[in-house]
Amino acid sequence: LRRLVSLTLYAHPFSSYCQKVQIAFYENAAPFTYRLLGPEDPAAMEERQALWPLGRFPVLVDDGVTVVESSIIIEHLELYHPGPVKLLPEDPKAALKVRFLDRFFDNYVMTPMQTPVFESIRPDGGRKEAMAEAAVALDTAYQWLEDHLTGPWAAGEDFTLADCAAAASLFYADWVRPIGEAFPKVRAYRARLLARPSVSRCVEEGRPYRHFFPLGAPDRD
């Protein structure tokens, strides 16, 4: 196995996908070098662009190997740097369920959550129909989750990759489209996520950047 100290993460603490990966690191207290992507460190921005010209982040470098996409980064950590908290079950069927839920949170919560954010920074102030569609999509996702949550965590009794995705997506989704009283299990699940040390650490690390949230960050969480 490669040494944990070989890990360098290019990320920003207010990014939902970066938080998703950082939660995985914090769950297993895995040491890594954090390169903040921002005007504070122009060199980090240049390095990330050279490592991954498509421009997305987070980007992980492990002993010279570049790893991209948040879910793949977490699976890479599980494969090469396993810790006491198993974020992906060894049982193939259980692992498939976790991977599905990871995709659910990224595609059906994170993506529509970002639509109003991006629309709000358009020069014309955003398209009302896009905002409305995002609200419907999030309510639909909340309802599906309300109907399928059967344990304390997304896939059941254990905290997994799916919860890393859920924490980052539901944290911001509730700012964009509040999780109403019609979804008590989802509200309680979000509260459990925010109370988990790895997640609360990410929330605190991102707090100084809340003024960047285009829709205005609520005075809570």
Residue ranges and their predicted role:
Residues 2-132, 136-139, 152-154, 220:
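GST-like domain detector, emphasizing the conserved glutathione-binding G-site
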Residues 11, 18, 35, 143, ...:
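Compositionally biased, intrinsically disordered low-complexity regions enriched in proline and serine
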Residues 12, 38, 161, 206-207:
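Short, solvent-exposed turn/loop segments enriched in Gly/Ser/Thr/Pro and often Arg
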Residues 45, 122, 179, 212-214:
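Residue-level signature of transmembrane alpha-helix interfaces in integral membrane proteins
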Residues 90, 201-209:
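Short, flexible loop/turn segments with low-complexity composition
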Residues 105-197, 202-204:
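GST-like fold's C-terminal all-alpha helical module
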Residues 206-221:
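Acidic/histidine-enriched, glycine/proline-rich intrinsically disordered or flexible terminal extensions
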